[in-house]
């Protein structure tokens, strides 16, 4: 059996043998904040998430909105709705886990198929993106599970000291 067929057989068989390897779609329930550390919220699995109450978003969701619209919306469309040459992240994030998101943004990705080529550039060296990966992830996760509507969040929590300290450290300030 050649290596390509073997890889395909493994990819098809592993989820059958171990159903936990199949990533199920994210939902508001899975994304619910169960813990908080200096203004950053986490779900039951310890993955960064959002907290939106009475129309007020946590700082990281708001920051993610700002950072997304600074660097990502040019290709992926406003509010993650996609464009003619980049996928709708508000849709694809429903089935993308946190490590995969971090890897794709940091390292980039190239998809070629059906006569079409899509290239996601690597942003691992761009501090304006890399220093805010959690924020962008949190914002897109909120959009993916319909917790955050389109447009600028009307109200936001204050910027926590932990966010200020991390930003200064990451940006070199």
Residues covered by each model-derived region:
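Sequence/structural segment immediately N-terminal to covalent heme-attachment motifs in c-type
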Residues: 41, 57-78, 103-107, 162, ...
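Bacterial N-terminal signal peptides that target proteins for export
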Residues: 1-8
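Sec-exported extracytoplasmic/periplasmic mature domains
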Residues: 69, 73, 77, 94, ...
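Boundary at the C-terminal end of the N-terminal hydrophobic targeting segment
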Residues: 22-27
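Flexible coil segments in periplasmic/lumen-exposed cytochrome c-class electron-transfer proteins
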Residues: 28-50, 58, 115-173
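Gly/Gly-Pro-rich "capping" loops immediately C-terminal to redox-active cysteine motifs
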Residues: 80-107, 119-126
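Extracytoplasmic/secreted proteins, especially bacterial periplasmic and envelope-associated proteins
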Residues: 59, 63, 67, 84, ...
């Amino acid at each position: 059996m050649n290596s390509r067929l073997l890889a395909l057989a493994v990819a098809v068989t592993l989820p059958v043998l171990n159903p936990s390897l199949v990533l199920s779609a994210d939902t508001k329930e899975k994304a619910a904040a169960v813990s908080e550390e200096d203004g950053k919220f986490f779900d039951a699995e310890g993955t960064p998430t959002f907290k939106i109450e009475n129309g007020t978003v946590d700082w990281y969701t708001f920051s993610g909105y700002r950072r997304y619209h600074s660097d990502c919306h040019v290709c992926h469309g406003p509010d993650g709705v996609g464009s003619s040459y980049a996928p709708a992240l508000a849709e694809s994030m429903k089935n993308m886990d946190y490590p995969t998101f971090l890897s794709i943004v940091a390292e980039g990705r190239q998809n070629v198929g059906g006569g079409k080529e899509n290239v996601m550039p690597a942003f691992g060296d761009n501090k304006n993106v890399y220093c805010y990966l959690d924020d962008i992830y949190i914002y897109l996760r909120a959009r993916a599970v319909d917790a955050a509507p389109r447009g600028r969040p009307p109200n936001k929590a204050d910027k926590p000291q932990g966010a200020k300290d991390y930003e200064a450290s990451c940006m070199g300030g």
